[in-house]
């Protein structure tokens, strides 16, 4: 392929001196709250995105002011685990260095800050560093935050799986010192050449997402990742993983060459071979991935374009190990288990529902204060889940009452929570996300109220339904793997997707395009009525919509999703 055909981002990476670019110069320039267009792409590798308040965009334009620029920073927290001391620093930063005065738990088991003025970026990153946290590779064309099932019951197996996730996260970090030089004031070592042994000078063609699942729970939505490891155990001990690859949610409205996809099963690998296979998959993607058309640059398209067999053979060649036949595992619920759960270590774990992951103080719900007070006395750890919730983990029996009392006092516990609400997530969308076409987080609680009311009307409130909403088709809340998926098309308008499996092993398919709330609810009212009277015993809503022909099953995303 000729150099002239490469996507613009490829040239930016080549010329960036291993992700340094002109970020330092942009940081020193305070006459504008933004970075240059090129550096806006490079800062993603450092963990943050440039945004602006879209609610104020037109008003500021009329006043001949530049947009109210700010930044969203996402931390790297493998497996979502941090200490109470770290959480107190995370909390302090949100209150002193952001304009949102909140913390947002993400769908990838980490947290992010919104509303960071450019002048506060360096201070914020240094604050994270003091707490042994960072935002390296939380965004950009690299391996992002590695997810791992925060399973509080099978804690021994979880610990083993978490160790793998943490190792992969650390091992696959970029080697460039750009982050340390720019944000932590480390001196650049003259005469030394940066070498990226896995990534190379141009890193990956696109983002790369990885997850470790511990069956039967699939809260990490393992099949939606570029690379997934499904733990296989014998007698409670980890012996290896089923490897899956080629998942991803992002697509573009109206462009049939883009589509969401679930990962393919490739086979079983031993625990000792995980690093070899992870590197092999990533380097095949590095070398085979599309660097001309970014919309077709994810691993899912690489596998589709080159073929499953060719991709598998190349991965085995680079790993130096053959896949064994995949082992039988049960893939089950994707939700979190709310309330207290006892672990095998005689410790207790309290899962708290955080609506859309937004931690802030509101009338009647002082969530941020509550978690701060818990962190001051808690002796275990905090575990963020991929459903945007928080687990207060490792609580001794004698400490339960005090922890629970604080949680109830601050509205973190005691909510009336339907099964559907507990299984549902939404992305941030407006007003900060520049890609959002419609509301998500701000509207989602009200929308779920309507869903709860319809389920009650038809006597199906006991049935949990996975509902997800995003403001655009990039799919940050994994809407295409939801039994009911709403994807923003325009203000107040969404595409309605139906038919995914409850367990996350089948995608959904568009049922209605560009419709408003009234039509969405009318469609669901009718379908809930039929589901109440026509469902088979134990049949989930997603499976029901496929069985009765409301939508066709998506078995091969490249062929079926847009058909």
Curated annotation (Swiss-Prot):
One of its GO terms (cellular component) is sulfite reductase complex (NADPH). It catalyses: hydrogen sulfide + 3 NADP(+) + 3 H2O = sulfite + 3 NADPH + 4 H(+). Its cofactor is siroheme; [4Fe-4S] cluster. Pathway: Sulfur metabolism; hydrogen sulfide biosynthesis; hydrogen sulfide from sulfite (NADPH route): step 1/1. InterPro entries: CysI, NiRdtase/SiRdtase_haem-b_fer, Nit/Sulf_reduc_fer-like_dom_sf, NO2/SO3_Rdtase_4Fe4S_dom, NO2/SO3_Rdtase_4Fe4S_prot, NO2/SO3_Rdtase_4Fe4S_sf, NO2/SO3_Rdtase_FeS/sirohaem_BS. Binds 1 siroheme per subunit. Binds 1 [4Fe-4S] cluster per subunit. GO terms for molecular function: 4 iron, 4 sulfur cluster binding; heme binding; metal ion binding; NADP binding; sulfite reductase (ferredoxin) activity; sulfite reductase (NADPH) activity. [4Fe-4S] cluster binds at residues 427, 433, 472, 476. Siroheme binds at residue 476. GO terms for biological process: cysteine biosynthetic process; hydrogen sulfide biosynthetic process; sulfate assimilation. Alpha(8)-beta(8). The alpha component is a flavoprotein, the beta component is a hemoprotein. PANTHER family: SULFITE REDUCTASE [NADPH] SUBUNIT BETA, SULFITE REDUCTASE [NADPH] SUBUNIT BETA-RELATED. Belongs to the nitrite and sulfite reductase 4Fe-4S domain family. Component of the sulfite reductase complex that catalyzes the 6-electron reduction of sulfite to sulfide. This is one of several activities required for the biosynthesis of L-cysteine from sulfate. This is Sulfite reductase [NADPH] hemoprotein beta-component.
């Amino acid at each position: 392929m000729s150099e002239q055909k490469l996507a613009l981002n490829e040239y930016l990476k080549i010329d960036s001196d291993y992700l340094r670019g002109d970020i330092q110069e942009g940081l020193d320039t305070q006459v504008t709250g933004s970075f240059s267009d090129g550096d806006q792409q490079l800062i993603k590798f450092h963990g943050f995105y440039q945004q602006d308040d879209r609610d104020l965009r037109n008003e500021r334009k009329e006043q001949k002011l530049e947009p109210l620029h700010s930044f969203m920073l996402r931390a790297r927290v493998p497996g979502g685990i941090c200490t109470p001391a770290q959480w107190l620093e995370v909390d302090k930063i949100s209150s002193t260095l952001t304009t949102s005065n909140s913390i947002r738990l993400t769908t990838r088991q980490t947290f992010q800050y919104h509303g960071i003025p450019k002048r506060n970026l360096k201070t914020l990153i240094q604050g994270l560093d003091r707490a042994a946290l960072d935002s390296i590779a939380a965004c950009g064309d690299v391996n992002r935050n590695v997810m791992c099932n925060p399973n509080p019951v099978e804690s021994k197996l979880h610990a083993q799986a978490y160790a793998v996730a943490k190792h992969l996260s650390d091992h696959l970090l970029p080697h460039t010192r750009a982050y340390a030089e720019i944000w932590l004031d480390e001196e650049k070592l003259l005469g030394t050449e940066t070498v990226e042994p896995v990534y190379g000078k141009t890193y990956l063609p696109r983002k790369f997402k990885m997850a470790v699942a511990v069956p039967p729970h699939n809260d990490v939505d393992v099949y939606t990742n570029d690379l997934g490891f499904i733990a296989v155990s014998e007698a409670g001990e980890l012996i290896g993983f089923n490897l899956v690859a080629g998942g991803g949610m992002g697509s573009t409205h109206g462009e049939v060459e883009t589509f969401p996809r679930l990962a393919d099963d490739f086979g079983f690998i031993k625990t000792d071979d995980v690093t070899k296979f992870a590197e092999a998959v990533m380097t095949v993607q590095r070398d085979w991935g599309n660097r001309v058309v970014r919309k077709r640059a994810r691993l899912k398209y690489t596998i589709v374009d080159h073929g499953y067999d060719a991709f598998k053979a190349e991965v085995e060649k680079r790993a130096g190990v053959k896949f064994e036949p995949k082992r039988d595992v049960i893939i089950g619920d994707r939700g979190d288990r709310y309330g207290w759960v006892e672990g095998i270590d005689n410790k207790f774990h309290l899962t708290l529902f955080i609506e859309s992951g937004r931690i802030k103080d509101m009338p009647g719900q002082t969530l941020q204060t509550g978690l701060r007070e818990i962190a001051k006395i808690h002796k275990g750890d905090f575990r963020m889940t991929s459903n945007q919730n928080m687990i207060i983990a490792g609580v001794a029996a004698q400490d339960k009452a005090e922890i629970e009392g604080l949680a109830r006092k601050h509205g973190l516990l005691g909510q009336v929570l339907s099964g559907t609400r507990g299984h549902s997530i939404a992305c941030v969308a407006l007003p900060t996300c520049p890609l959002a076409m419609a509301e998500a987080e701000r509207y989602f609680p009200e929308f779920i109220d309507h869903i709860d009311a319809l389920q009650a009307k038809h006597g199906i409130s006991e049935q949990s339904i996975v509902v997800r909403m995003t403001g655009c088709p990039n799919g940050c809340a994994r809407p295409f793997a939801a039994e009911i998926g709403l994807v923003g098309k325009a203000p107040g308008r969404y595409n309605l997707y139906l038919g995914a499996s409850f367990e996350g092993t089948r995608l959904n398919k568009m049922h209605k395009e560009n419709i408003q709330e009234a039509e969405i609810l009318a469609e669901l009212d009718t379908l809930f009525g039929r589901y109440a009277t026509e469902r088979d015993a134990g049949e989930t809503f997603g499976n029901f919509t496929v069985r009765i022909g409301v939508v066709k099953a998506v078995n091969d995303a490249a062929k079926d999703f847009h058909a």
